[in-house]
């Protein structure tokens, strides 16, 4: 530990030391490394503060905008991080943190991550990555085979082909979706005659040449917001993302899709892509992928499947049928940092046809030369870390049967929780789980009885107070720090398709137990009873209706 009367200096000798000499085992950082390797969960429990602290208070620790003019000892700075940053982080790996698409991670990833950081490979080019490039190509090939199931000869021919790629690693699903639609756009508005293609001449010239007024991307109203980002970046415009109605199971409505396509074509707007969602963010629902593929084929447009969440289900022989038709996609997005259990920052887009990515191929004499196997020729992002190493390791250590166990238990746990909710007099299941995601809300039995006989006007009033009560329960539960569920807004049939605030849970963490789920409901019930505004108002309205 550094004494108070010693200060660090910015000499070149001290700078060389931080590049070449590790921290001593008894230093703050050395002790932390030991704690992390011995008991990660205990370290997180001890250092992350459970109680909620207002963001305005946390911001007070991060207000100095001036660049430090004097260095700080590593141990001293580590203590600072523990006090200000680690303590106010979110314990996303906690078994009771079931509100978002996060989970505990396998222990072996921590030391492997240190190796990855130490190697500091840059996957843009073979000269800065060497073996990491064929490894990444292999991982993309493994996922391609999981989705599309081609024969050995296909992968022997294409997986390491210099001028082709089976997909791209990305920082996440957003870049993966943008990449898929970038390929779709460049293929649709390809070179023809004197027109040199959209990549060379731009969108305005492309629309003029192809004599259309715009492009359209069709996706369900439950589609991810990244698709609007993609439309914005690609020059299509956010209005070019056409939201298609969903049915009562939150799956895209095919009749409305046909209507929206006809309306777009009547305005001389060209269908660019149909996007099927395999695991919506809000409800975990899966669109009818096979039927969407048929529509896309008929319209001659790109069929993309956003399986950022649900794609890992393909690992399960028991449940992969839920993604029936995904093999008909032109491209598929999968996030490894979701149900493939690697750290944040690993998404992928996989293309069925190895030729497709040639439409976005780029070259630069100093780095991305023609004929090279550099991955950067086909990726939106340039410099990238070797995250494929961590996914490759998970594939080998966990294996497909291991992933199947993880996927199966998560889905079965969701069904257990759904059944548990339905057994309660004062809770109501809103959406049945297709994968391991479901929504529900707290509705006291007397409120249910009142809703059965209430007028439409009275129902609207009850809905408003139920929404306020749901927000109160969710916020209080988060601030208390024992457990966490998120909330979202849906338009369920049971509530006359009115915007309705509901609890949302994601059960991907293998450490989440049935007892934890039982306690979540018990805690929510206790919090509801402590409400001093919403619940009394509800009881007053309900009392007037029932009496």
From Swiss-Prot:
Tagged with keyword Lyase: yes
Effect of a null allele: Deletion mutant cannot grow in minimal medium.
UniProt keyword list: Decarboxylase, Lyase, Pantothenate biosynthesis, Pyridoxal phosphate
Reactions accelerated catalytically: L-aspartate + H(+) = beta-alanine + CO2
Cofactor: pyridoxal 5'-phosphate
Pathway where this protein functions: Cofactor biosynthesis; (R)-pantothenate biosynthesis; beta-alanine from L-aspartate: step 1/1
Chain segments annotated as coiled-coil in the UniProt record: none
In-chain residues carrying the UniProt-annotated modification N6-(pyridoxal phosphate)lysine: 338
Family, per entry: Belongs to the group II decarboxylase family.
The protein's role, per its UniProt record: Catalyzes the pyridoxal-dependent decarboxylation of aspartate to produce beta-alanine. Has weak activity with glutamate.
Protein name as catalogued: Aspartate 1-decarboxylase
Source organism: Aliivibrio fischeri (strain ATCC 700601 / ES114)
